[in-house]
Each structure stands twice: as structure tokens, then as C-alpha cells.
Amino acid sequence: MRFIHTADIHLGATPESKMDWAVHRGDEMWGTFERLIKKVKEDEIELLIIAGDLFHRQPLLRELKEVDYLFSTIPDTKVVLCAGNHDAIKKGSFYRNFEWNKNVYFLDSKTVDCVPIDDLGVDVYGLSYYKNEITEPLYDDIQIKNPYRINILVAHGGDDKHIPINKRKI
């Protein structure tokens, strides 16, 4: 299986916003994401994992539609993503009711959930942030459903304020 794992893309960010080139830098981030999708298509990647913070803040509806359109250009690739601490699923978030393309699996649970991707023989585990800081070690008690499949954890965080990870318990 060929897959790409990425995180912290931060679409919508304007780094160093007081600089003259800040708007262009934000556009470059979108361009980089578009090149990633093109690379997925060219290399016939079977699974694309985005482990949080696709956006730097709550995504606008038009931004979700644009991302979903890009995902629609790679219909043979399964896409699994979750919300991170920057784009956490808060009240009023467009993430809550967004209908993704059929090749996209959005891990929208507050607790670890499993997405089985049968045609790849893969189970993908993960959760989404619903607030910017989570101090509970939510990944510690994962129960693998089928040890004979490929099991992948999509985890965002790892420090004391962002779902601490104890490697011995995973």
C-alpha cells in the first residue's frame, strides 16, 4: 500500500501578517496543498492521511468546498482526516454537517473511533479535537479491532496540553 501522511498544513494562516508578503504566503500554502493532491494523483497513492490542523482556524464553508473539490480529483485515493487543535470542531463549525466526497473519511468523534477501509485491508483509528487544548491521554486505551489488518493511528498532539501520548500504552 502506498500512502502519504501529513499534518499541520494550516490553510488560512497568514504568517507574519504585518509583512507585505503575508497574503502571498497564505496563497503559497494553498498552492502547496494543491501540489500535494497532484502528487497523490501522479504517484497513485492509495491512502492520504491528514492528522489535524488542515486549517489554521475554523474553516469557512467555501474553504471546505474547495478542499473537498480537490479530494474529488483523487477518487481512487481514500482520504482520512481529523480536526486538530487549531481547527477544532467547535459550536457552529462547518465541519459538523459537511458532506464529504465518498472517498473521504472525516474522524469527527471526540473519542477514538475506527474507520475500516476494507479494500485496502486497513483500519484507521483517530479522533478530532473539539477544543484547543485536551490534557487527557485519549489514545492510551485504544483497542485494536483486528490485529490481522494494517492498523494506523491518526494522532494529533503529544505534549501535555494536546493529548499526551504514552508510547508504552499504545
Regions found by a protein language model. Give the residues of each.
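N-terminal active-site segment of His-dependent metallophosphoesterases
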Residues: 1-66
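His/Asp/Glu-rich metal-coordinating catalytic cores
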Residues: 47, 57-170
